């Protein structure tokens, strides 16, 4: 069964309470034949992989974006200004088909400048370099001020992109 599970990487979109709820909403809306797209961030690494070495837990990054991913890169891009810098977004879409009926989309925004090379030991990285880490991890450690600020930047980036996408589609 392991070889079957490894044939298609799980994007972890339905993991956790909110992720599962969002996936169910998108699927149900499509099944009912209603239009209703979702918006989020295109995190490069999802929930961490738990490894054990010498009877000690080690957290490793868990990349879910592979060459055969369901992500479709679009030509849509927006500028998101912050106080001291501006980030350029890249929009990816995932089709969410309903049961025997419609299909909606999950829109996932990424940054052009994300750098997986900044990952150090396991899942540690410089949380202050927003341009390089904004969409790096689904659940960055926010137990310190840098992590809390990163979460605020992530939320602002997502909301700004979502608003710009809605306005673009309303034209």
Where are these regions (language model features)?
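A conserved ligand/cofactor-binding region detector
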Residues: 1-171
């Amino acid at each position: 069964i392991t070889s079957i599970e490894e044939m298609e990487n799980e994007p972890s979109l339905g993991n956790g309470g909110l992720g599962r709820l969002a996936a169910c909403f998108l699927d149900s809306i499509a099944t009912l034949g209603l239009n209703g797209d979702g918006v989020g961030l295109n995190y490069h690494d999802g929930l961490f992989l738990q490894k054990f070495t010498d009877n000690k837990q080690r957290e490793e990054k868990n990349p879910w974006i592979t060459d055969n991913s369901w992500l479709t890169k679009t030509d849509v891009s927006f500028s998101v200004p912050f106080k001291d810098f501006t980030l350029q977004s890249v929009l990816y879409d995932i089709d969410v088909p309903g049961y025997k009926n419609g299909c909606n989309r999950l829109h996932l925004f990424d940054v052009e400048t994300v750098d997986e090379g900044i990952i150090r030991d396991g899942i540690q990285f410089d949380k202050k370099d927003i341009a390089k880490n904004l969409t790096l991890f689904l659940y960055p450690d926010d137990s310190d001020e840098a992590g809390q600020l990163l979460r605020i930047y992530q939320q602002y980036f997502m909301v700004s992109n979502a608003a710009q996408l809605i306005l673009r589609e309303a034209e």
